Amino acid sequence: MTVQTVKILSELVSTPVDKLLAQMKDAGLPQTSASQEVSEVEKQVLLSYLKRQHGEEGDNSQRITLQRKTTSTLSRDGGKAVNVAVKKKRTYVKRDDEEAQKQEELAKRLAEEQERLAQEKARLELERKQEEEKAAKAKAEAEEKARQEAAVKNVVADAGAVNETEQYVSDTGAAEPVESPKQPKASKKVSQPAMDSKKSTVAPKGKKGPVRHDNDKDKDKPRGRVNPDNKRTSRVNVNDEDEFTRRGKLGRKNKKPSKQEHGFQKPTAKMIHEVALPESITVADLAEKMAVKGAEVIKIMFKMGAMATINQTIDRDTATLVVEEMGHTVKFIDENAVENDMIEAIDYQGEAIKRAPVVTVMGHVDHGKTSLLDYIRTTRVAAGESGGITQHIGAYHVETPHGMISFLDTPGHAAFTSMRARGAKATDIVILVCAADDGVMPQTIEAIQHARAAGVPMVVAMTKIDKEGADIDRVKNELVAQEVVPEEWGGDIQFVGVSAKSGEGIEALLEAVLLQAEVLELTAVPSAPAKGVVVEARLDRGRGSVATLLVQNGTLKKGDIVLAGLQMGRVRALLDETGKAIDSAGPSIPVEILGLDGTPEAGEEFIVVADERKAREVANFRQGKYREVRFARQHSAKLENLFSEMGKDEVRTLNVVLKADVRGSLEALIKSLTDMNTDEVKVNVVSSGVGGITETDATLALASDAVIFGFNVRADNSAKQFIERESIDLRYYSVIYNIIDDVKSALSGMLSPDLREDIKGTAEVRDVFRSPKFGLIAGCMVIEGTVYRNKQIRVLRDDVVIYEGELESLRRFKDAVNEVSRGMECGIGVKNYNDVKVGDKIEVFETVEVARTL
């Protein structure tokens, strides 16, 4: 064995001698110079030390690493040789018997698993092929059966034409058999419908092409299906219309069909849909339910005489006609199912007790309704109201010696018709106020009609009986003319004379009301969830939406979930009519609540529900339905007016942004303003709402060139600055009369003026002569008024107008003058007219514009 020194060892391991000596010293070996010898044992000691330094542990005697270096010479074209050294390093590991055994077991298990998977795959493939063959066979049988039935029908249809059939047989030699051929090879051509339908897909035998394979290993297998006899067959597809396109190149659809290709035609029977129709539906949604295009529905509607667009909302009756016209069936659905289910789930059962009556005071304006209530309540409401008139519904409850009574005070002005109608619906008894010195007035008659429409009994209070000129008998006679007959005259209505100033008759009036309430036997269930009506609603800064409710049944508590019309919310606070916080309100108690997410419409019914999620769902549904109805109404109006507006002059519009303090006053204002609309001018309420005037309202008014009306509200600071900067017209009002008068005068100014002809004078022709400069001149005598030179004239002959024009010259003697008075002679030259005769009259007139009023 060759003896190695430290120097030789350093060359073998490619390590500097100094570094190797340092490592040997650290390993505890005695070598200190490069010439000293190194034994095999010392090499192993050094190797073990180095392995420990590099983190390797354990006995690695099973591992051996071999390095080999080979040197070769590479000759280049220039004759220069290049030495090439190749170093190779390999490591061999000798595994122990236990590890080798584990590796063999693992390999064996892997082989078994692969074999099992291959068998399972083969079984699934065989089942799939069998299913495809069954499906293809079933389709082929169905097709053959259809062909047979078609052939039989053709033979039956041709049975009546015997001569033509015989001629056809003689020409062709033999008729084709009716039965389908037993051998599929008998037909060498595929029928044209089968070729056009492209329902089959054939993989041609031996044809090479970019066919998609499930596995790369299948690339060498013959294309097509292999049956159990190892015979290749072509694959037939009758299910997938695009199978061939997916498996072949684009543009290679028109391949020659094989003998096994089957024809398949789509079913041509029309699909009849059952269309579920709500109360209203858009044309687009209706078309979607019938699986047709919107244009088809519009075409049908045009044929039926109805103009429509794809986004137009139509009613259920129109939709039913369209659906039946297109051959489908109709099924009506109830959109209010969720709402009805929620209402039906509320239990109003319980012990019924007697409740206080709800009394509405109605009558003509300034007949003393609020003053009468003031005396009963011992307050001074009327003195604090703008203009001394009531402009929203007030709700109060009063404890009297005879029992509790809840009062609703309604406005008497003509603009508040809807408020009076709501007051009549929400009440049990109506006190009809009629002034003894004024008698029956228009709003008195209207209040009678509202009470009768609501089926509410009346008690007549004749006010101002202590005033001079009061005539109770006259009032009774006028009311009898309206079929309101007092008890003493044989009727069923109590008449009571009262004075709100002295208090005369007040006790008798309250007794009459409570007597009527006893007859009605009014009851309620206090333990049930509350329900009633919204009397009024407004938007209050700092508190949000404030709604005045009248509880008709049940008890309203703080924290209840209230659903009122389009709005809902949890009751955050309950306030009585004096502003005092309370925890609950029973039947017949008016109360203000905070917590709704908006201002509900006055007159809406409210209920208390247990599930907040359902309440929000119903509120959202009502809002969506309201939007649909409003859009349908607007769209219908546009279509109806489309042709009627053609040829008319443009309507002048006064744009208005309207803000009010309460919802009822806002509604009355909108109705009063829109009632002023005519064919020439109209009021367009661009925006309306409850609450103060904001910068958003001012911006909208600027964009739409509108006037801002604030009724008992004011603009905030930012809105004031914006309005002053942009010079927007802002008007504040506290009395509804003033708004109506101002708008009426503004609309009157927008009307086109009337043209009126004002006759200034008449001259009679006494002689006719010619002038070389002016032609025919009429010598006239002014018999009426004054004749002016610069005004229009008419020539009358036997009091019939024969010419209308203007004067060319007016002279007295030889001087040209501007006017000639009555009783004086003058010469008149008529412009472009030379047929003046003696006895004609020349009438001078002026067209005057006269301002119109509404």
Curated annotation (Swiss-Prot):
Residues 499-501 are annotated as: G5. Residues 409-412 are annotated as: G3. Residues 247-257 have a biased composition (Basic residues). Residues 388-392 are annotated as: G2. PROSITE patterns: G_TR_2 (PS51722), IF2 (PS01176). Residues 52-79, 128-265 are annotated as: Disordered. Keywords: Cytoplasm, GTP-binding, Initiation factor, Nucleotide-binding, Protein biosynthesis. One of its GO terms (cellular component) is cytosol. One of the essential components for the initiation of protein synthesis. Protects formylmethionyl-tRNA from spontaneous hydrolysis and promotes its binding to the 30S ribosomal subunits. Also involved in the hydrolysis of GTP during the formation of the 70S ribosomal complex. This is Translation initiation factor IF-2. It comes from Marinomonas sp. (strain MWYL1). The gene is infB.
